[in-house]
Design a protein with these regions (language model features):
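Short, surface-exposed beta-edge/turn micro-motifs
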Residues: 50-52, 65
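An exposed acidic His-Trp-rich patch
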Residues: 59-150
Length: 229
């Protein structure tokens, strides 16, 4: 019997060619943080275009599979009921602060991709809650993002910067200038039922521009993976 080629069945995995790195915090305990490698692929079209990501604790062949994340546009997020919105974290601060990096992209491609991510939202659960354990233990954790200065574990940031040869501080300066908005300062969620905010702690949740700029088109997709250099 002729057996089909193995790659015929690898479509879902082969689509996850977009890589970036960031930091996830447990929503119920924002001080618990994990450096998280995102391997993402696109699905859907138009308003319902989204990224599906598998998450690992490192880039090594033996990396631990931490969990999953779905990424949708601001338009999709705002269409969700409040009961659902509590699961979705903003990416705005992570982008402008340099918390998210895509080290295999060229500088130009990375700016384009981060501009796209700026107003998106992610829903992430870590099914391996504590990556220091030998096997996954306990219930899955709903994960969150840093949303203001002083929230990130700086030792994790320094270790990530050393690993990939990047500077979060320099990346922040470049992003703010290129994208044209001030870095937002939103406190951590008060509880697991708190609905996230992108730009402000209260009032109208809108950005403070540094200069005339425009937000990326909602729902616009990026299929980027250009090698740096």
């Amino acid at each position: 019997m002729n057996r089909p080629q193995a790659d015929k069945f690898m479509g879902p995995i082969g689509n996850h060619s977009l890589f970036f790195c960031g930091f996830h915090a447990a929503k119920q305990n924002p001080e618990f943080q994990v450096t998280t490698m995102h391997y993402c692929g696109m699905r859907g079209e138009g308003d319902y275009e989204m990224h599906q990501c598998v998450l690992y604790d490192s880039v090594s062949p033996g990396a631990k599979l931490l969990g999953i994340e779905y990424i949708v546009s601001d338009k999709v997020f705002r269409s969700l009921p409040d009961e659902e919105k509590k699961y979705w974290h903003p990416h705005t601060y992570e982008v402008l602060s340099g918390g998210l990096v895509a080290p295999v992209m060229s500088d130009e491609a990375e700016i384009d991709f981060m501009t796209y991510l700026l107003t998106t939202w992610g829903k992430s659960f870590h099914t391996w809650p504590d990556p220091t354990t030998a096997v996954p233990l306990g219930e899955p954790l709903l994960m969150w993002s840093q949303t203001g200065d002083g929230q990130a574990d700086m030792e994790l940031v320094r270790e990530r910067d050393r690993r990939f040869g990047v500077s979060t501080a320099e990346t922040r300066a470049v992003r703010v200038k290129a994208i044209g908005y001030q870095v937002p300062q939103v406190p951590p969620p008060r509880s697991v039922t708190t609905i996230g905010r992108q730009w402000t702690a209260k009032g109208e949740d809108t950005p403070a521009p540094l200069k005339k700029s425009r937000l990326p088109e909602l729902g616009r997709g990026q299929r980027l993976g250009t090698a740096r250099g």
